[in-house]
């Protein structure tokens, strides 16, 4: 089940990227961080905190600024990307649930194996297999499989094992920021003031949901303690 959810998330995000920009794809995918507490509420009866509700409102506002046009409609790419975000949220909750009982390395291997089988099955069913791959395709496949997927998740798991939760959440939330940065540099995406405001709202929503801005309160407490009497 966990592998199938990962397959659905990857597929929706990838197909969404065909009809939207990389920057919008990165930020709309990041909404899974905000959705996780509500998926936990629906499936595991763990009520969201007031910070989660605030993050949800901010995130909805950000999605509206990023995705909705003047007719309040959403294009296919943005809709598929949001669906991918929902699947990532379901996947994260499932991993948290089963990861408590299973070896994380084995669980990761099973996820990738199941996801790969689903991808192969769907490609055989709906795609025409080429006799030869285009020049440069092997390099792209190796980059996506090794660096963008396996190595990225491995470094994330290792980093989270030695980093406190709040700083780790902030660092992970920067994924969407780097997505926009590389989209501007490599893809030539134009970030309008409306898009920038939407990106900022989604980013703040992710940080609020993941950290409750606890790092700000700790910083203020340290300053107060260091102040002369």
List PLM regions with ranges.
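Transmembrane alpha-helical segments that form core, pore/gating elements
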Residues: 36-38, 42, 73-127, 141, ...
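C-terminal transmembrane-helix exit sites in multi-pass transporters
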Residues: 32-54, 177-197
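Hydrophobic transmembrane alpha-helices of multi-pass small-molecule transport proteins
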Residues: 48-68, 84-88, 118-119, 173, ...
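Structural signature of hydrophobic alpha-helical transmembrane segments
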Residues: 14-32, 74-87, 135-146, 202
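Hydrophobic/small/kink-forming positions within alpha-helical transmembrane segments
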Residues: 3, 7, 11, 34-38, ...
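Specific transmembrane alpha-helical segments of multi-pass solute transporters/efflux pumps
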Residues: 1-29, 65, 145-163
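Membrane-interface helix termini and inter-helical loops of multi-pass transporters
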Residues: 15-19, 64-76, 123-141, 184-193
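C-terminal-most transmembrane helix of multi-pass membrane proteins
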Residues: 137-139, 172-229
């Amino acid at each position: 089940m966990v592998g199938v959810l990962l397959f659905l998330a990857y597929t929706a995000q990838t197909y969404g990227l065909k009809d939207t920009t990389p920057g919008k794809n990165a930020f709309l995918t990041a909404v899974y961080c905000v959705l996780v507490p509500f998926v936990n509420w629906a499936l595991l009866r763990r009520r969201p905190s007031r910070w989660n509700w605030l993050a949800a409102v901010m995130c909805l506002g950000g999605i509206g600024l990023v995705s909705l046009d003047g007719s309040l409609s959403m294009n296919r790419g943005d809709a598929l990307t949001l669906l991918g975000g929902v699947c990532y949220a379901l996947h994260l909750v499932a991993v948290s649930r089963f990861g408590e009982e299973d070896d994380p390395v084995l669980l990761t291997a099973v996820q990738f194996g199941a996801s790969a089988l689903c991808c192969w099955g769907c490609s055989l069913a709906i795609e025409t297999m080429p006799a030869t791959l285009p020049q440069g395709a092997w390099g792209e496949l190796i980059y996506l499989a090794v660096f963008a997927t396996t190595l990225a998740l491995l470094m994330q798991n290792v980093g989270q094992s030695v980093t406190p939760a709040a700083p780790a959440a902030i660092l992970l939330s920067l994924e969407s920021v780097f997505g926009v940065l590389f989209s501007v540099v490599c893809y030539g995406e134009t970030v309008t003031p409306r898009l920038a405001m939407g990106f900022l709202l989604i980013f703040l929503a992710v940080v609020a949901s993941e950290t409750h801005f606890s790092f700000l309160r700790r910083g203020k407490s340290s300053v107060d303690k260091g102040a002369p009497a």
